[in-house]
């Protein structure tokens, strides 16, 4: 089995400006191999696996549904996940799915790539998918899991997260068939399966293997694993800790939802910090060109300010505006750890001093809503923050958080040109640009 270093060394997305290191109390991390300038690209990573974030059977959003699972009324290419323009004559469907779309609609499936046929932005994407991510087995499995086979109905009565887990497992098992080497990389990523498979693994493994057991590849010397309950549980653990969401365009009301999830083998090694020094960008809807059409799902990580050699490079796993209690809850539930970064230490002291979490949240919200001019007054002339400021992250939010209403994205300069830093800041959520007039 490949080691983490093998993964980092073999993936073509790896760059010479970061290296793997062991940091006490944090485990494996990516650190700067040299001094980095603001806006410098430290990683460009391609996914080894992508799957749709749209449930097999979409339902009307409910207040209890996570905002990231509430989807706008858009369709996406089932290969590159660009927005589909149905008026375009190049849009094509999967030849197998389109044969069953009418039957699926009768059973309540519908169409448009959500629960009926799978659509592609053109013949090239369809050909690529049919040979990789949307093989005949995937097509059959998704159709049966969706609603074409009556015995799959129990899945459709489960919450939408379970349906997305089913999508992931189909994609992961297919990866084992079409690319055993990439499947090995997936298995090497962080995420330990529980000693005993949980309810999700038990249910999904039994369901998938009763409806559409994956075929074993023939004549592959690389194939040395078997599809088992233990493997299903291990895969779900990898997905939980390593999947990155490719976001839909920011809605007018500020809703942030995911169009697809991807496993990025190098980007998975970035640790979290609540005041990150880097942020990731994706350009899924970038115009397709002869050279870029296959790279639109890449992740690009840029540092947001100068970083000295040897410093760990961290991302925030969620929008930086979340308050202390929400951040700790998400990190504990989704990633299994408690954050002790500098920001969390300060805000934990607020909580201890006040003795009331509600007061802490209220104080944060008030600070977040302060006028930018007032925040700047709290900063020192050299760009630092006044030591007596009760909100020591004010400068970070002022300079590196997008001020577009309901966006909460992180700003990073465009890459330097000929060694000269850019004064243009780009938001990694809404894509807005602004001139950096901070000192």
Per-range role (PLM):
Residues 32-35, 259-262, 304-307, 331-333:
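A general structural signal for short secondary-structure junctions and capping/turn motifs
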Residues 156-296, 333-334, 340-343:
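Catalytic cores of histone-lysine modification enzymes
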Residues 32, 42-43, 120-121, 270-271, ...:
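Short hydrophobic-aromatic micro-motifs
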Residues 52-174, 274-439:
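C-terminal SET catalytic tail plus cysteine-rich post-SET Zn-binding segment of SAM-dependent SET-domain
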Residues 11-14, 71, 264, 396:
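A short, polar/charged loop/turn motif at coil->beta-strand junctions and beta-hairpin connectors
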Residues 1-52:
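N-terminal alpha-helical interaction blocks
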């Amino acid at each position: 089995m490949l080691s983490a270093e093998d993964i980092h060394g073999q993936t073509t997305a790896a760059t010479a400006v970061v290296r793997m290191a062991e940091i006490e109390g944090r485990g494996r991390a990516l650190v700067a191999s040299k001094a980095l300038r603001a806006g410098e690209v430290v990683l460009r990573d391609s996914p080894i696996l992508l799957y749709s974030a749209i449930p097999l059977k979409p339902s009307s959003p409910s207040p209890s549904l996570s905002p990231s699972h509430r989807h706008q009324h858009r369709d996406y290419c089932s290969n590159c996940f660009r927005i589909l323009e149905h008026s375009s004559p190049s849009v094509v469907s999967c030849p197998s799915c389109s044969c069953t779309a009418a039957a699926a609609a009768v059973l309540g499936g519908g169409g448009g790539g959500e629960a009926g046929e799978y659509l592609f932005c053109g013949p090239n994407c369809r050909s690529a998918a049919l040979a990789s991510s949307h093989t005949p087995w995937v097509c059959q499995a998704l159709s049966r899991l969706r609603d074409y086979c009556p015995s799959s109905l129990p899945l459709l009565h489960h919450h939408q997260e379970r349906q997305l887990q089913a999508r992931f497992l189909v994609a992961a098992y297919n990866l084992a068939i079409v690319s055993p080497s990439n499947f090995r990389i997936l298995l090497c990523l962080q995420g330990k399966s529980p000693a005993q498979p949980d309810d999700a693994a038990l249910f999904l493994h039994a369901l998938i293997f009763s409806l559409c057991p994956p075929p074993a590849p023939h004549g592959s010397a690389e194939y040395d694993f078997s599809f088992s309950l233990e493997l299903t549980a291990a895969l779900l653990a990898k997905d939980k800790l390593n999947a990155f969401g490719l976001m839909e365009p920011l809605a007018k009301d500020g809703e942030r939802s995911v169009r697809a999830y991807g496993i990025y083998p190098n980007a998975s090694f970035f640790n979290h910090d609540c005041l990150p020094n880097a942020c990731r960008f994706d350009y899924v809807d970038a115009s397709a060109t002869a050279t870029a059409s296959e790279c639109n799902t890449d992740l690009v990580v840029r540092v947001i300010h100068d970083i000295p050699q040897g410093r760990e490079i961290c991302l925030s796993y969620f929008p930086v505006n979340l308050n202390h209690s929400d951040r700790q809850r998400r990190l504990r539930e989704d990633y299994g750890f408690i954050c002790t970064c500098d920001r969390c230490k300060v805000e934990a002291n607020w909580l201890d001093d006040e003795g009331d979490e509600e007061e802490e949240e209220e104080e944060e919200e008030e600070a977040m809503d302060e006028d930018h001019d007032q925040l700047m007054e709290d900063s020192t002339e050299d760009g630092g923050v006044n030591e007596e400021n009760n909100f020591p992250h004010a400068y970070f939010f002022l300079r590196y958080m997008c001020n577009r209403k309901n966006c909460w994205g992180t700003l990073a300069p465009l890459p330097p040109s000929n060694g000269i830093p850019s004064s243009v800041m780009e938001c990694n959520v809404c894509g807005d640009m602004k001139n950096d007039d901070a000192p």
